[in-house]
Design a protein with these regions (language model features):
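Glycine-rich phosphate-binding loop plus the immediately following alpha-helix
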Residues: 186-225, 229, 233
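A glycine-rich, aromatic-flanked flexible loop/lid motif
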Residues: 179-183, 229-236, 284
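PRPP/pyrophosphate-binding module of the type I phosphoribosyltransferase fold
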Residues: 170-173, 178-180, 185-189
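Short, highly charged low-complexity linear segments
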Residues: 181, 185, 212-216, 318-322
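Nucleotide/phosphate-binding catalytic cleft detector across ATP-hydrolyzing
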Residues: 1-173, 192-203, 235-322
Length: 322
C-alpha cells in the first residue's frame, strides 16, 4: 500500500500531513560534529543520513533562501525525508509538494525535483546520541509538484472524503499565500487556474527589518540583537542580557510597512480582487499579520493558515492516486 502525504518544505517551517497525522516544526537542521554535550544528557532525536548525523535545532539551517537550486540539493532531500519520517506508516509513499510561483514556471524544474526525491532512501533515527538507532526505509514512488497556493484551494474546496463542499468549485478565488521567503498569488475561475504571480517578499523580510530596527533603537546602549534572538516567530518580547525588552511598537510598525508592500505586490500582479468571489489569505505570514491586514468584504484569513497548504497537498495526492 502507498501512503499519501502532503508536504510543504518551506524555509521557515516544515508542514507535513497524512491521513491521520500531521506535524509543524521549524525547518532548521544542525549537523553534529561529534563534540556535542548536554548537561541534561540528551540532545534530542538524531537523524542519520549518508553517514552524517543531524538534529532539529533552532540555530540550525534550512536548505537555502530564495534560490531554486535548493530543491536539487542533498539538504532538501534530507529535509523531505525527516518530514516524511514524522508521519510515515508505510514504506512506499506518494508526495505532493509546493513551490513558489516563479519556480513553478521554470522549465523542467518540476521534473528535476520529482526525479531528485523519488527512489529508495534510508534514514536512521535514534532518541539520543549513542542510543540504538532505527532504520527507516522510505521509498518515494510518486512526487507531484504544484504551485504553493493550490494547497489552500484544495483544502477549502474538498473535505477529507475528497468531496466538494457546498458547490465551492463554482466560485472564483484569489489565494494569497504569505510565506517565509515569498508571497504567491493564485487566481482561479472555479478549479481552473486563471493566473499565478509571485514576489520575493515574505516573513524573512519582516525578520530582517525588525532586527535592523531594534539594533538601531538600542545602539546607544551597546546592545546587539540577531535573528536568533527574535526567532522565526518574530517575538515582540526579547529576553537577553538578563533583561526583557518590549519591542511591540517597533514590530507593529515593521508589519504595517510590510502590508503596504504586500498591497503593492497584489496590484502589480494585475489581479483585481473585486472581480473574484472570495479572497483567501493563507500561510504563516497571514497569521502573523492578522492584526495588520485590513480585510475587504470578500476577504478572509484562512482559519488554519499555517497547515492549509500541506492539508490541501495531501488531498491532491489522494485525488491523483485514487
Amino acid at each position: 500500500m502507498t501512503q499519501k502525504i502532503g508536504l510543504e518544505v518551506a524555509n521557515g517551517y516544515i508542514k507535513v500531513v497524512s491521513d491521520d497525522s500531521e506535524a509543524v516544526y521549524p525547518n532548521r537542521l544542525k549537523m553534529l560534529t561529534g563534540s556535542e554535550f548536554s548537561l541534561t544528557g540528551t540532545i534530542g532525536t538524531v537523524y542519520e543520513f549518508n553517514n552524517k548525523k543531524y538534529i532539529l535545532d533552532e540555530k540550525g539551517d534550512s536548505s537555502g533562501g530564495r534560490s531554486a537550486d535548493r530543491y536539487l540539493s542533498e539538504d532538501y532531500l534530507l529535509e523531505t525525508l525527516v518530514a516524511v519520517s514524522q508521519v510515515i506508516k508505510e514504506r512506499n509513499v506518494a508526495l505532493t509538494i509546493g513551490v513558489p510561483c516563479r519556480d513553478f514556471e521554470v522549465k523542467d524544474l518540476k521534473t528535476k525535483i520529482a526525479n531528485h526525491l523519488k527512489g529508495r532512501h534510508v534514514l536512521y533515527i535514534s532518541n539520543n546520541l549513542e542510543e540504538e538507532k532505527e532504520e527507516y526505509i522510505i521509498n518515494i514512488e510518486d512526487v507531484y509538484v504544484v504551485v504553493e497556493p493550490l494547497g489552500t484551494l484544495c483544502e477549502f474546496v474538498f473535505n477529507d472524503k475528497l468531496q466538494i463542499v457546498n458547490n465551492r468549485d463554482n466560485f472564483s478565488y484569489v489565494i494569497i499565500d504569505i510565506g517565509y521567503s515569498t508571497t504567491d498569488i493564485l487566481a482561479t475561475n472555479g478549479l481552473r487556474i486563471d493566473k499565478i504571480f509571485g514576489e520575493d517578499i515574505g516573513c524573512m523580510d519582516i525578520s530582517n527589518d525588525y532586527v535592523r530596527a531594534i539594533n538601531k533603537l538600542q545602539g546607544d546602549n551597546r546592545y546587539s540583537f540577531t535573528l536568533d534572538d527574535v526567532t522565526l516567530e518574530n517575538k515582540a518580547i526579547v529576553e537577553k542580557y538578563g533583561e526583557k525588552f518590549d519591542f511591540t511598537d517597533t514590530l507593529n510598525e515593521i508589519k504595517a510597512t510590510f502590508v503596504r508592500r504586500l498591497d503593492t505586490s497584489i496590484k502589480k500582479s494585475g489581479i483585481n480582487k473585486n472581480n473574484y468571489d472570495r479572497i483567501i489569505y493563507t500561510g504563516g505570514g497571514a497569521l502573523a499579520l492578522k492584526e495588520q491586514i485590513k480585510l475587504g468584504h470578500n476577504e478572509v484569513i484562512y482559519c488554519d493558515a499555517q497547515l492549509a497548504n500541506a492539508r490541501g497537498f495531501w488531498k491532491f495526492t489522494s485525488i491523483k492516486k485514487g
